Swiss-Prot record:
GO terms for cellular component: cytoplasmic stress granule; cytosol; nucleus; prospore membrane; ribonucleoprotein complex. Residues 1-27 have a biased composition (Polar residues). InterPro entries: Euk_RNA-bind_prot (IPR050502), Nucleotide-bd_a/b_plait_sf (IPR012677), RBD_domain_sf (IPR035979), RRM_dom (IPR000504). Coiled coil: none annotated. Residues 111-189, 199-267, 313-389 form the RRM domain. Interacts with MEX67. This is RNA-binding protein MIP6. Residues 1-35 are annotated as: Disordered. Keywords: Cytoplasm, Repeat, RNA-binding. GO terms for molecular function: mRNA 3'-UTR binding; poly(A) binding; poly(U) RNA binding; RNA binding. Pfam families: RRM_1 (PF00076). It comes from Saccharomyces cerevisiae (strain ATCC 204508 / S288c). GO terms for biological process: mRNA localization resulting in post-transcriptional regulation of gene expression; mRNA metabolic process; regulation of translation; sporulation. The keyword Repeat applies.
């Protein structure tokens, strides 16, 4: 036993000397670790030798363990290789299967038809029962709302055979289908392209009051010239559209029916393109290539050859609700007769709109003015009258009238002010009349009758678009009825009963006789010349700054206010905190409007502060209540925005900014 012990130790020591380089290169810590591991191994070897009795058995055991580990590694490698091959085979099968499915999908193409104008009660089962007579019919789909699951009024029909799809379209297109006339056409995603490839034919002056001219009969006539994708008859306008699948068919139809009789009426037809396409720069070149004689740019041009005056066919509709659409106006006014066009003016939200409706015939236009005036439309009383051209300012050369109509007159632009102005400018007049009061913007309307055309032209040039008393005066050569429903008749005399109602309006009662404040009296004459449009009135009662909303002399009707009432009108003085708040609001609103004012340097904080304080001190005389009300109006009133911009410009000029 002692000898075996020594042999084992010698064997271990010999094994440890097989790689002397690694030992020599090791650090001292590694040597200590190796010595400890050697001691542990030697101790284990002693135990094995003592238990087995000889060294050979221990060596055989080690060899067996090594062989077993090698065999396990080979088995794992073989299994991994086999699994990889199996995965590759599965992938190849999947790819082959997918390619077959793609090939099947390509070869078995479905022909889809769009079916529109379906009744809400029509279901997919009802569609299947009708179209199952075609052998290649596959399925029917009714499109529904995602949340409510209600029918959207259209769906799709799928056929395997293209011929069956065409037969179904010709048989059922524009026929009554469960109580409604349906439209069936090929499913096309790019409708804009379909409408603008030169195959959309427009028809005007169709006799749609003729019961024989139905959409179905119109469709059957048009398919004789080619494949019709869809057609439309607009009975409210006596117009129609036909979409062909090629431009040759479209040209043949135009050649056949343009300026020809159709069901007893002489009609006009031509190629039609959407407005979006017509406004593109390249459309002019395209129009020349197609032929300008067969292109109709707008449906309004289709009736230019008619002898009636177009102006007499147009009516003006006022006080329409702000949410009114063209379709609603078209439905309401087409009860009188066919309409050529409808135009709704664009105004700000929550304000009454007006519309211009043009009829086909002058008789129907007169009938609409008589029957629909002051009727209820969407809970609003509308005003219907003759349509007039929009007033064009400063085009006086063609005018021979001597009466100038004025609107947006503030309280300080009263009869006395206008008469003093005429005397100063040597304008001869026979009458100055204030006729109406507008309750929406607290302004007056009136007119001035001059002796001659030259006097009227001079007065027009002086007052038109002039800011007087916080209101932008508008002059015109014809009476404007835009706010006729919001106006109160007014007489210059003090016995007007209607005007007494105005006295109870607290917001207006604060306009009273005042004298210039101390800070305004201290202004230099040069500054007064800059801010006042009529600087030569400095010695009269009209020398007040024209941009100040409070007048120097009140309107004659306000003489009815007694002294007792006038004493109650005095407002309590505002605190510094309230003034600071209104100045901060004014500064923010001015900052928002700077993009409309081309003055450099105003966007700086200190400059905005100076401009705001100047406007508050000079133009509004520290009256924070009136200024706060005015700032609220700037959110909805374009006129108030223009007034504020004018005040900012005048203030910037006075403070030395380059305008």
């Amino acid at each position: 036993m002692p000898n075996s012990h020594g042999n084992v130790l010698n064997n271990i020591s010999l094994n440890s000397k097989q790689n002397p380089r690694s030992i020599s290169k090791s650090c001292p810590n590694d040597k200590d670790a190796r010595q400890k591991s050697f001691k542990t191994i030697s101790a284990q070897a002693l135990v094995r030798v003592q238990g087995a009795g000889y060294k050979l058995g221990d060596v055989k055991l080690k060899d067996a363990e090594v062989k077993e580990k090698n065999s396990l590694k080979k088995y794992d490698c073989k299994n991994a290789t086999q699994e990889k091959k199996e995965q590759e085979q599965v992938f190849e099968k999947t790819v082959a299967k997918g390619s077959v499915q793609k090939y099947i999908t390509k070869t078995s193409k479905t022909n889809s038809l769009f079916i529109g104008n379906l009744k809400s009660t029509v279901t997919e089962e009802m569609l299947r029962k009708i179209f199952k007579r075609y052998q290649s019919f596959e399925s029917a789909k009714v499109c529904r709302d995602f949340l409510t699951k209600k029918s959207l009024g259209y769906g799709y029909l799928n056929f395997k055979d293209k011929n069956d799809a065409e037969s179904a379209r010709k048989e059922f297109n524009y026929t009554v289908f469960f109580g409604q006339e349906v439209k069936i056409m090929p499913s096309m995603k790019n409708t804009l392209f379909r409408k603008n490839i030169g195959t959309n034919v427009f028809f005007s002056n169709l006799p749609l009051e003729n019961p024989q001219l139905t959409t179905r009969s119109f469709y059957l006539i048009m398919i004789e010239y080619g494949n019709v994708l869809s057609c439309l008859l607009e009975r409210r306008k006596n117009i129609g559209f036909v979409y062909f699948d090629n431009d040759i068919s479209a040209r043949n139809v135009i050649k056949k029916y343009n300026n020809q009789e159709f069901f007893g009426n002489k009609i006009i037809c031509g190629l039609h393109f959407d407005k979006e396409v017509r406004t593109r720069p390249e459309f002019t070149k395209r129009k020349k290539m197609i032929g300008s004689d067969i292109v109709i740019e707008d449906e309004l041009l289709a009736s230019n050859n008619l002898s009636d005056n177009a102006r007499s066919k147009t009516i003006l509709v006022k006080n329409l609700p702000s949410d009114t659409t063209q379709e609603e106006v078209l439905d309401y006014f087409s009860t009188i007769g066919p309409i050529k066009s409808v135009f709704i003016s664009e105004k700000q939200a929550n304000t009454p709109h007006k519309a211009f409706v043009t009829y086909k015939n002058e008789e129907e236009s007169k009938k609409a003015q008589k029957c629909l005036n002051k009727t209820i439309f969407k809970n609003h009383t509308i005003w219907v009258g003759p349509g007039k051209d929009k007033p064009v300012h400063n085009q006086i050369g063609t005018n021979k009238k001597t009466k100038v109509y004025l609107k947006n007159l503030s309280f300080n632009c009263n009869k006395e002010f206008i008469s003093q102005l005429c005397l100063q400018e040597k304008i001869r007049f026979s009458e100055i009349k204030i006729t109406n009061y507008n309750s929406l913007n607290w302004t007056f309307c009136g007119h001035v009758e001059c002796f001659s055309r030259s006097d009227a032209e001079r007065l027009f040039n002086i007052l038109d678009r002039r800011l007087i008393g916080s209101s932008l005066v508008e002059a015109s050569w014809s009476k404007n009825n835009d706010n006729i429903l919001n106006e109160i008749d007014y007489d210059d005399g003090n016995n007007n009963e209607n005007y007494k109602k105005l006295i109870n309006i607290s917001s207006m009662m604060r306009f009273r006789t005042q004298e210039l404040s101390a800070h305004q009296k201290g202004l230099t004459s040069q500054f007064q010349q800059v801010v006042s449009p009529f600087s030569s009135y400095s010695n009269s009662y009209t020398n007040m700054n024209s941009l100040v909303a409070t007048p120097m002399k009140p309107h004659p009707a306000f003489n009815l206010i007694t002294n007792t009432v006038d004493e109650k009108l005095h407002q309590p003085k505002r605190t510094k905190q309230e003034n600071a708040e209104i100045l901060e609001s004014l500064k923010k609103i001015i900052n928002r409007n700077l993009q409309r004012i081309s003055i450099s340097g105003l966007n700086k904080e200190e400059n905005l502060r100076s401009i705001s304080e100047f406007i508050f001190d000079v133009f509004w005389e520290h009256d924070s209540e009136r200024l706060s009300h005015f700032l609220l109006m700037t959110n909805t009133s374009l006129e108030s925005q223009k007034i504020l911009q004018k005040q900012v410009t005048r203030a910037a000029e006075s403070l030395g900014f380059t305008v």
